[in-house]
């Protein structure tokens, strides 16, 4: 098609593009029909119509159009091809983009089409195929960059298969690269050839050659800052064990960049490596040489410290790092037990650091890294020194606008807490400290930064009481304090993050939603911070909000993947090859995110139970439309933990790290297990519906049904063993929102669903044998009603005359949500069973049979009615169907019972929000009391909205 014809076509299609861009999909569909009415052979308009149908969620209609047009031998213009690509990407059929361009180059092997095929292969990580296309582009069009695309494809193949890469792929890539450089030289102003050569050398682990390569004049054009170039060169030398050369370069560089912490780490690690080499033998000369290495490091640190004064932190931290690394030596240096003469006394150095850098908020984090290296005596001496110093600072006159004293107090209290002093204090001491912190936070003209750090310190103290003693009153006081700070502090996000974590334990979804909006979390952070809110909407029964949140997360992952792939394509075009492996790794990281998979599975689960009505659509959603025949399965063992637990800082003792590590492992395992449980349940439910699908091979459908039900049963039994009923969620401040898997698997609800799934398996076998099912296959209505009432009756636990504890309402809300999910799941199973019976039973009357003859009198009519009644009674399948339909009545009754129970629960007179707050706090009590009414009102409204949402769901679904 000529440019003029293409311009005419684009002008004709412009209204459709505008409607699609403005998301007016019905108008876009109308515009497509208008164009096709006048120009029925316009392929671009047909494909745009398919794209519109995809966005209107009419995938079947869109697929019909696409399959008719995307056939071998078809010619398509550029606008049509672009529309095809959008269709396939929007419907997650990325491999069809590859097939599309493979067909196109058979009829039109233009440079543009071959380039698009190369990029399509790149998106699907088909590196062998893209290598061939790269070479074809180079041979056909003689453009050197295409040659380098082929070389880069070899490097990517080598990364996928390291063994083959070292033997064949990387040597081949090296030879190809050298041949091209010898033939054409380096491209002026471009780093493409250099990038490739360095990647090849790194892949072959030729560290000496890598270091020499960076010394070449041409290396200056590599896409990295000069100081990064120096650091990378030293990193290569370290790997090649050229420690003397590293020392020479690093010592020269550190005098120019004294605050570059990476240089200090390299110098120290190089020194340690040389010491370890010396200690391999007990030779006196080697031992003396080891002493000299330590002394040389000490002299360098001292020299740079004098050079920079207290303007830079890195030279002073280097002293602590040297102590730490030398202490880690597997074999200690003889005659050097005390290094005070070289580096100075460690505690004195740490006190000196605190006195000179305490105004920097990062000062505590710098010191905390090295507290674990101190002995008990050293810790005690450090605390004594800090107490003396804070006394001196406090004695100084106050200066208006100067917060030096506040930062000194903050550093002191954080150090005391991290070194275990808080654990030695009694309850009165803790309360007094809490009072002082509130006074400092509420002080007039307190800067937002200092206020936020003070609040974080205070929250750590109150969260401890909640974690260790389950003190819900102090937990509520913590929420009040956080709300007090969040109301006035617009810049510090830590308080809002801590509030989200606190409210997630209370299922206070309304306030969580508001806080997430005010935080303005960046899109990519939704992956790492999603754990703060992920299961809350589901556990609290707000299923529509859960679906919205999960949909937003899914869209974020799709958009991130698209942007990464676009960046990779751009990197190929610009010759920035060193960025491609990193971006490919990022893409893989996003694809294997456990959070992403958990969101997708929960969306399928909740949408099928509470949103969709059509049985066929429910079946497809439950099974997963990306897995039509069951070949693709989630590999749960490959999923990656992308959660960021450093979002909420902590000031704790060394033992807390072990608790944190244990929490990370346990909560990640729970996330995987609950997601797999939902997934196996979805697939088992979907497999029941797939038995009735026309396009399913009957034997495969039945095999899948048996296998998926067995998988669900086995995983449910596994979860019951792994998560005993007495297990409680982690109460660490950094832990994710609780999933309550233990409560769910021991509630009895999932076991009920399993019973009906197993009945469905037996039902299919019975029907296949030509027999009709008995009512007993699914149990009686009375049995169902008894189990449902037991599932729903979840009154708060208390002794006679005893008041309920604060926030008692949270547990019944969670149990009600899970009970509602059970009722909905059973409803879906029964609907699917009903469809199976209607599909598989031969000659089942679905309506009342017509009489054979027309009776004239009352006697004849009565006889006809009796005959029909007898015929229906004799048909077991009809009786079974009527029994299934009657069981739906029990489900509706259970829904109404749950509705009534929620109303009664809200009517209980027991207060679920603590009222005795701020005791023994003196004047600081006013700050908490001022927040009590608005916070209590928000919590009550949130709990009420949660119950109302469940009421609405019950009315709509049952």
From Swiss-Prot:
Localisation per UniProt entry: Cytoplasm; Nucleus; Chromosome
Signal peptide extent: none
GO BP, sorted A to Z: chromosome segregation; cytoskeleton organization; DNA recombination; DNA repair; meiotic cell cycle
UniProt entry tagged with the keyword Signal: no
Function, in words: Non-catalytic subunit of the NatB complex which catalyzes acetylation of the N-terminal methionine residues of proteins beginning with Met-Asp or Met-Glu. Required for chromosome organization and arrangement; specifically for assembly of the central region components of the synaptonemal complex onto chromosomes during meiosis and for DNA double stranded break formation and repair. Acts downstream of xnd-1 to regulate levels of histone acetylation in germ and somatic cell nuclei by controlling acetyl-CoA production through antagonizing the acetyl-CoA hydrolase activity of acer-1.
Phenotype of gene-disrupted mutants: High embryonic and larval lethality with viable progeny displaying a high incidence of males phenotype. Defective chromosomal morphogenesis, segregation and alignment due to the failure of central region components of the synaptonemal complex to assemble onto chromosomes during meiosis.
PANTHER family named in the record: N-ALPHA-ACETYLTRANSFERASE 25, NATB AUXILIARY SUBUNIT, N-TERMINAL ACETYLTRANSFERASE-RELATED
Name this protein carries in UniProt: N-terminal acetyltransferase B complex subunit NAA25 homolog
InterPro entries reported in the protein's UniProt record: NAA25_NatB_aux_su (IPR019183), TPR-like_helical_dom_sf (IPR011990)
UniProt tissue specificity: Expressed in germline and somatic cells.
GO molecular-function term, one example from the UniProt record: acetyltransferase activator activity
The TPR repeat ranges on this chain: 7-42, 78-111, 320-353
């Amino acid at each position: 098609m000529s440019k003029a014809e293409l311009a005419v076509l684009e002008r004709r299609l412009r209204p459709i593009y505008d409607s699609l861009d403005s998301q007016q999909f019905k108008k876009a569909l109308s515009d497509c029909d208008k164009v096709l009415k006048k120009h029925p052979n316009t392929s671009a308009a047909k494909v745009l119509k398919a794209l519109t149908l995809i966005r209107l969620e009419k995938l079947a209609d869109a697929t019909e159009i696409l399959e008719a047009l995307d056939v071998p031998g078809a010619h398509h213009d550029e606008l049509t091809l672009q529309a095809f690509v959008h269709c396939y990407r929007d419907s997650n059929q990325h491999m069809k983009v590859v097939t599309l361009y493979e067909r196109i180059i058979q009829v039109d092997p233009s440079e543009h089409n071959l380039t698009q095929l190369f990029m399509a292969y790149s998106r699907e990580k088909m590196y062998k195929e893209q290598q061939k296309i790269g070479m074809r582009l180079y041979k056909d069009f003689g453009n050197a960059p295409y040659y380098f695309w082929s070389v880069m494809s070899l490097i990517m193949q080598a990364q996928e298969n390291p063994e083959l890469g070292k033997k064949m792929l990387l040597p081949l890539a090296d030879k190809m690269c050298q041949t091209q450089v010898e033939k054409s030289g380096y491209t002026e102003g471009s780093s493409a050839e250099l990038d490739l050569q360095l990647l090849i050398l790194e892949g072959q682990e030729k560290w000496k050659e890598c270091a020499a390569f960076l010394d070449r004049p041409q290396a200056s054009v590599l896409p990295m800052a000069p100081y990064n170039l120096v650091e990378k060169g030293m990193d290569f030398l370290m790997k090649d064990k050229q420690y003397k050369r590293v020392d020479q370069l690093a010592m020269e560089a550190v005098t120019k960049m004294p605050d570059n912490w990476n240089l200090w780490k390299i110098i120290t690690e190089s020194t340690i490596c040389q010491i370890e080499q010396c200690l391999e033998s007990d030779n006196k000369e080697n031992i003396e040489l080891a002493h000299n290495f330590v002394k040389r490091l000490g002299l360098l640190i001292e020299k740079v410290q004098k050079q920079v004064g207290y303007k830079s932190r890195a030279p002073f931290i280097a002293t602590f790092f040297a102590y730490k690394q030398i202490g880690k030596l597997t074999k200690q240096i003889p005659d050097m037990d005390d290094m005070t003469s070289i580096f100075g006394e460690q505690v004195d150095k740490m006190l000196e650091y605190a006195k000179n850098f305490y105004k920097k908020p990062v000062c505590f984090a710098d010191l905390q890294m090295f507290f674990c290296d101190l002995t008990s005596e050293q810790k005690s001496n450090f605390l004594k020194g800090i107490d003396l110093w804070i006394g001196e600072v406090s004695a100084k006159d106050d200066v208006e606008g100067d917060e030096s004293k506040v930062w000194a107090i903050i550093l002191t209290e954080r150090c005391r807490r991290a070194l275990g002093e808080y654990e030695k204090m009694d309850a009165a001491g803790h309360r007094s400290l809490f009072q002082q912190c509130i006074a400092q936070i509420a002080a007039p003209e307190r800067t937002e930064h200092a206020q936020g750090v003070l609040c974080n310190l205070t929250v750590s103290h109150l969260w401890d009481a909640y974690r260790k003693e389950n003190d819900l009153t102090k937990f509520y006081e913590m929420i009040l304090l956080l709300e007090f700070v969040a109301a006035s502090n617009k810049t510090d996000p830590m308080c809002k993050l801590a509030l989200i974590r606190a409210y997630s334990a209370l299922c206070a979804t309304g306030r969580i939603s508001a806080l997430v909006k005010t935080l303005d979390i960046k899109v990519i952070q939704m992956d790492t911070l999603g754990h703060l809110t992920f299961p809350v909407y589901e556990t609290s029964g707000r299923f529509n909000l859960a679906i919205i949140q999960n949909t937003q997360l899914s869209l974020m992952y799709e958009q991130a993947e698209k942007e990464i792939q676009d960046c990779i394509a751009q990197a190929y075009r610009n010759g920035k090859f060193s960025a491609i492996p990193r971006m490919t790794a990022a893409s893989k990281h996003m694809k294997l995110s456990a959070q992403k998979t958990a969101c997708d599975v929960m969306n399928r689960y909740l949408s099928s139970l509470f949103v969709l009505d059509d049985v066929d659509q429910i079946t497809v959603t439950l099974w997963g439309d990306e897995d039509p025949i069951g070949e693709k399965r989630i590999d749960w063992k490959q999923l990656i933990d992308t959660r960021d637990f450093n979002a909420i800082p902590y000031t704790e003792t060394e033992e807390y790290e072990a608790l944190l590590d244990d929490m990370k492992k346990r909560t990640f395992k729970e996330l995987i297990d609950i997601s797999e449980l939902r997934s196996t349940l979805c697939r088992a439910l979907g497999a029941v519906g797939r038995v009735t699908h026309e396009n399913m091979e009957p034997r495969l459908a039945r095999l899948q049904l048996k296998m998926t039900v067995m998988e669900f049963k086995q995983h449910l039994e596994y979860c019951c063993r792994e998560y005993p009923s007495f297990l409680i969620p982690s109460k660490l401040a950094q832990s994710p929102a609780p999933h309550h898997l233990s409560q769910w698997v021991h509630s009895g609800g999932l076991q009920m669903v399993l019973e009906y799934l197993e009945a469905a398996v037996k039902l299919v076998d019975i029907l296949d044998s030509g027999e009709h099912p008995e009512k007993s296959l699914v149990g009686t209505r009375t049995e169902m009603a008894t189990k449902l009432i037991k599932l729903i009756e979840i009154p708060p636990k208390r002794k006679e005359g005893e008041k309920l504890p604060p926030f008692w309402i949270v547990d019944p809300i969670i149990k009600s949500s899970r009970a509602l999910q059970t009722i909905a799941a059973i409803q879906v199973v029964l609907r699917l069973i009903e469809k199976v019976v209607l599909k598989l039973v031969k000659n089942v009357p679905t309506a009342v049979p017509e009489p054979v003859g027309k009776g004239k009198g009352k006697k004849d009519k009565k006889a006809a009615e009796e005959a029909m009644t007898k015929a229906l009674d004799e048909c077991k399948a009809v009786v079974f169907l009527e029994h299934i339909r009657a069981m739906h009545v029990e489900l509706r009754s259970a829904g109404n019972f749950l509705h009534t129970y929620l109303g009664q629960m809200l009517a209980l007179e027991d207060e679920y929000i603590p009222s005795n707050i701020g005791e023994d706090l003196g004047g600081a009590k006013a700050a908490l009391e001022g927040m009590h009414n608005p916070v209590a009102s928000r919590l009550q409204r949130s709990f009420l909205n949660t119950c109302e949402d469940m009421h609405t769901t019950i009315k709509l679904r049952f």
